[in-house]
C-alpha cells in the first residue's frame, strides 16, 4: 500500500507558518532555560522545505472515513530550517579565568563581568528517524507520538561561530532542547494545529478567549486618577470639601491628579516616617536616600518643605532606668516601730523599671534607695569582752553577738551623668589574722586557768608567754643551791638521801595545751650544782641523774621563782612543792615509827613502794 503526500499546500499557506511560529515560541519558552540565556526565545523564520519525509507503514489498527490509527517508521533529511532570536550573557574571558589557576590569571576587573549580547541561531540540515504512532479523527484532530528520540543530527549556526567554545556549547544545549521538543511539545503543537483546521468549535472557543484576554472597548480608556476619591486631600494633606472639588476645572489634569485618597496618603506617610531613624533594621526603599530627622523644624527645611499629614513630628525621647523606691527600715526605726505594722511596699515599685518620657528630666517620682547591711563575719575578741578568772573559778566563754547596722545613706545618682561605682563605707571591717586569733585564745586560756591549791596560801601568778632569759635562770639556780646548803645543815645525821625528782610524780600538775605552750629551746645543765631542769634533754636519761636532797622551801622562794619563770618553770615549781610536802609528811611519820623507818631504810626506799602514795601520772616531759 502506498501513499502520496501533497507537501506543497503546506508551503503555500501563509497562515499555517504564522500559527506554527507562535506555537513553537510558546513551547520553547515553556521549559526552564539555561542561565546563559537571559531573554525569551522567539521563532522568527520557519520553513518546512520542499522535500517531504519518508513514511513506512508498519501497522494499521483502525481505518475508516473519519478516523485512522497506524504505526509508521519516519525518516527525514530535507531542507527545512528554523531561525531563533534571543539574548545571551556571554563572557569568554570569564570562562577562561574559571579554567585557570588564580595564581597565573591576570585578574581583570571590567572584562570579568557578564555582557548581554543579542544572539541569532539558525537550525538547518535536520535529520530525523524514528517510529511514529499516528491517530486521526475529525472530531479530535491529529495525534502524533514518537516512541523513541527521532533527532539524529542538525546544524546550528549562530553569531558566535568564530568562538569554538561558544559554538560547541550552543550546539549541545540546542540539541538537548530539541530532543525535549520532539518528545513532549511537538505532539501537543500538532494536535492544536489539527483542531484549528478541522474543528470549528475549537476555533470559536479560541476567538472568545482571545477577546477576554484583550478586551476591545468602544470608547477611549478612562484615567482612574481623574475620578476623585471618597476622601480627597491635597498635596499638603488637607481634606477638600465638595465645593472645592467642584470649583476645580475638569480640563486641569494636574490639579485633578493631585487629589489622593486620605488612607493612601497616611500609608505613604507611615512608610516615609519609618525611614527617619538610625536603626539598621528598618525597611528600605530603592533609589531613595534618607537621613535622620530630629524635629519638625528640621523636617520643614527638607527638599519638599512639607510635613506629612496626620503624622506628628518626631522628637528626641530619653529613657532612663528608675531606681527602686522600696526603702528598707534601719535598726532604729525597727526598734521604735516594733508594735506597728510596716507600710506595704507594693506602692514603692511604681517608679521601678524603664521610664520613657519626652523630656530629659523625667525622674520626679524617683526616690532614694536605702540599704541595710548585716555583718555576719566573726570579729576578733577584745580585752573588754573577756572576763578575768581568779582562784578556782571555772572556764567562761564570751561570744560577740551578730551586729546589725544600717549603711550610710547613698546620695542619689544623677541619671544624666555617667554611671560611677558605689562609694565604699567609711568604716573598714578587717578580718582578724591568724596571729590575732592565737593571741586571743592564749589570753582566754591564761585567764581561765586554775590556780595553785589553797594549802600553799598563794594563787598562781600571771603567766609570762615570753621565754625565760639567762638572768632569771641564774637567779633560780642560785636560790636552789642556797636551799640545798640550808637543808644539809638542818638534816639529821641518820636520815637517808631522798630519791631524785625523776622517781616521783607530782600530786597536782598543770597540763598546758600543746597549742598554747610555746616550744622553748632547752638549756644545758650547769656544772656548778647538781640541779637539773625537768624540761632539759638530760632528764630523759636516768643514768645521768644524780640524787638531789631537797627540804622545806620558803614561800618567798616559790613566789620569786614563779614570778620569774615561764610555764615550764611554774610546772616544775608545782612539782617541787608537791615533793617537798610529801617528804615532810614522810619525815613526820618516820619520826613517830622508827622501826618502820629502819625497815624502809634497809629496803632502800620502801616508802616509794607504797601503791597508795605512788602516782601513775608521767612527768610532763614524757607526755605526748
Swiss-Prot record:
It is a multi-pass membrane protein. Residues 215-225, 332-341, 525-554 have a biased composition (Low complexity). Residues 360-372 have a biased composition (Basic residues). GO terms for biological process: mitochondrial genome maintenance; mitochondrion-endoplasmic reticulum membrane tethering; phospholipid transport. One of its GO terms (molecular function) is lipid binding. Disulfide bonds: none annotated. Residues 209-230, 332-395, 407-466, 483-554, 583-624 are annotated as: Disordered. Keywords: Lipid transport, Lipid-binding, Membrane, Mitochondrion, Mitochondrion outer membrane, Transmembrane, Transmembrane beta strand, Transport. Its main location: mitochondrion. The keyword GTP-binding does not apply. Residues 1-195 form the SMP-LTD domain. Residues 373-384, 433-448 have a biased composition (Basic and acidic residues). It comes from the Eukaryota. One of its GO terms (cellular component) is ERMES complex. Lacks alpha-helical transmembrane segments, suggesting that it resides in the membrane via beta-sheet conformations similar to those predicted for other outer membrane proteins and porin. The SMP-LTD domain is a barrel-like domain that can bind various types of glycerophospholipids in its interior and mediate their transfer between two adjacent bilayers. Component of the ERMES/MDM complex, which serves as a molecular tether to connect the endoplasmic reticulum (ER) and mitochondria. Components of this complex are involved in the control of mitochondrial shape and protein biogenesis, and function in nonvesicular lipid trafficking between the ER and mitochondria. MDM34 is required for the interaction of the ER-resident membrane protein MMM1 and the outer mitochondrial membrane-resident beta-barrel protein MDM10. Component of the ER-mitochondria encounter structure (ERMES) or MDM complex, composed of MMM1, MDM10, MDM12 and MDM34. Belongs to the MDM34 family. This is Mitochondrial distribution and morphology protein 34.
